[in-house]
């Protein structure tokens, strides 16, 4: 049989990957324009020509409205997700919303970057009403595009490795779109302002031109996804997935203290990062007096981002996540000292920017949150995969909303609004700017470090211990399910792989007890042993829980010691909740890599509620073929 792990990407798959990656180039650039530079436009050009006192009141009003609307986005996202999920068209469910969302939000972005055609100069009350309606619509259609873009990954590929590549490529181009915007914003706004007025500055006409450029890129990127990818009507898309509400998220956080502390540490880090990132334009323009060199901030962020992402897995082989998080936070803390004490020296600022962007926080937080799933399962019997997936995006939206509010408040308080220049900003206003832009985020970054070191207990070693203890608990049947109805059922088990069948106590190094069997596999493929569904997967990918259509619950564990590989070499061909048929491919694993790391590759299958099993009939130990009937169980089904 051909080892499926050795398949190479076809030309069509490569086109799909490139098309999908291009989608986030414009999508991320659009988000950058909306979340960061729209507020810059509001404070500097939207109310150009109005008395400063009136302009500041309108800036405050718009800033408050943006914060409220962005916070409301957290609540409506699940609703939009349901709408996308229930869409059925000849083009699929995701691509129509990707294109519609991009086109509508892009048109509305251009409209609000005109100052709604100068309506504020005519009637500011009418302006506030129209702006609120337009911004809500813009935010909704942007969210449609966002939900559709990331939601379509399982529709493109059934292979977890491929899905990981799609996601990584999307994140890569997203970084280019986000940081590339920082590099072009000043040249583009200056160019279009010069074309319209003959002045070398960032005026309203320049911001209008900037919005057109961003909108065109966003629409073209969405079209690349629509025409370059193909949605598949596969089992993964039809997996039964429960929608996660905001109530579910907060409930999951409250009942799992590690999710709580990891989330709080990330919230502090994210607040520091987004606030400082949001005011860097003002820093270059009003403190340094060098707006034309603002592109350096984007260039540094791009280079450092490209370096730290591939560097993380290499460093993590020798350095723990907690240490890597600490290194990143210490670098961020030092960066603020360079910004504060070297604010007039471009070299010092450059060093500060390098340190500011040298962080592993997002990677560490994602992995730590993922590991907290097994912690919660061991602690209270609840797995919160959906909650964990929703936590970081929710926190990003919350911090993004507050960032918009803080940036607007900082600009007004420090007098960095309207046609003000660096020469108009007094020393006292610069001090005010520093308090909010640097000292306050410095405090947030210190709190993030303290919380993570003091309260976060999920390390790689601790997680390995939790997984081992959890498997022992599951195999012994220590945690009993709640019984609402009990039926006696019969289930036939078919070999999930070809190889030598063994008893559990015949596997060297196996500490699992209970009822089950093991197979020394001939190949690195794992197939479904009966008709049923995937209940859950450990974050280390080497263990999955399955349940038959008759209610028989089992754990399939690949390898002894493979928990230490942290998922390397394991590729799943399903998502949690997916229904499968006997003989469907569930997983591929690299036998050579497992052996190279000094571990065994035995496939162990055991049943998690042995107290409910009435009778077990197994064939004798011998070489079996995948799909061959090897056991028959009579059990009490709790459903």
UniProtKB/Swiss-Prot annotation:
Gene3D superfamilies noted in UniProt: Glucose Permease (Domain IIA), MFS general substrate transporter like domains
Show the segment(s) annotated as Permease. Answer: 1-473
One Pfam family from the UniProt entry?
A: PTS_EIIA_1
Which InterPro entries does the annotation name? Answer: Dup_hybrid_motif, MFS_2, MFS_trans_sf, Na/Gal_symport, Na/Gal_symport_CS, PTS_EIIA_1_perm
List the molecular function annotations (GO) for this entry: kinase activity; symporter activity
One GO term under biological process is: sodium ion transport
- Taking the record's annotation, the residue ranges forming a coiled coil are none
CDD domains, per the entry: MFS_MelB_like
Q: Which NCBIfam families match?
A: gph, PTBA
| PANTHER family named in the record | MAJOR FACILITATOR SUPERFAMILY (MFS) PROFILE DOMAIN-CONTAINING PROTEIN, MAJOR FACILITATOR SUPERFAMILY DOMAIN-CONTAINING PROTEIN
What information about domains appears in the record's comments? The PTS EIIA type-1 domain may serve a regulatory function, through its phosphorylation activity.
Q: What does this protein do?
A: Responsible for transport of beta-galactosides into the cell, with the concomitant uptake of protons (symport system), and also for transport of homologous and heterologous exchange of beta-galactosides.
Family, as annotated: In the N-terminal section; belongs to the sodium:galactoside symporter (TC 2.A.2) family.
Protein name according to UniProt: Lactose permease
